[in-house]
């Protein structure tokens, strides 16, 4: 279960403090699908960054399976992110010098996964890109880049 309790996120700038999230409360149960929708500038990306352990709230509690994520250090949050979350960024965040296979293999290196090349190749096959395994991002269409991110 994922819980947010009275979560605020404030970005401090020289000109002003921007209150991106105010008193957010949210419960997401295991197996539940959730869609985050709102106007531009409403805090969707900020919320997703917190939920994905990429950022911490300014105040409030973020709990995953009753453990407070804010109490974790960067390495612990990275490990949690690698185990529990999958991301498809708006810009896909592919590294320009890596092939499709290397892109998918990269997070597996940090998780010490054995047979990571084979697992990465299987993931690319599942999204229909086995024939593009050695292609770099500039050789892939936008849709193909997105599928590499999904893999």
What are these regions (language model features)?
Residues 1-151:
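ABC family nucleotide-binding domain
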């Amino acid at each position: 279960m994922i819980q947010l309790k009275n979560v605020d996120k404030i970005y401090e700038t020289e000109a002003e403090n921007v209150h991106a999230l105010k008193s957010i409360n949210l419960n997401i149960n295991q197996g539940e699908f959730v869609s985050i929708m709102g106007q531009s500038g409403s805090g969707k990306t900020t919320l997703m960054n917190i939920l994905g352990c990429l950022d911490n709230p300014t105040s409030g509690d973020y709990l995953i399976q009753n453990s407070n994520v804010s109490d974790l250090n960067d390495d612990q949050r990275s490990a949690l992110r690698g185990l529990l979350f999958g991301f498809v960024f708006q810009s896909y965040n592919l590294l320009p010098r890596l092939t499709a296979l290397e892109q998918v293999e990269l997070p597996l290196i940090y998780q010490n996964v054995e047979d990571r090349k084979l697992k990465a190749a299987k993931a690319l096959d599942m999204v229909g890109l086995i024939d593009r395994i050695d292609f770099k991002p500039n050789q892939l269409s936008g849709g193909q880049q997105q599928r590499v991110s999904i893999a």
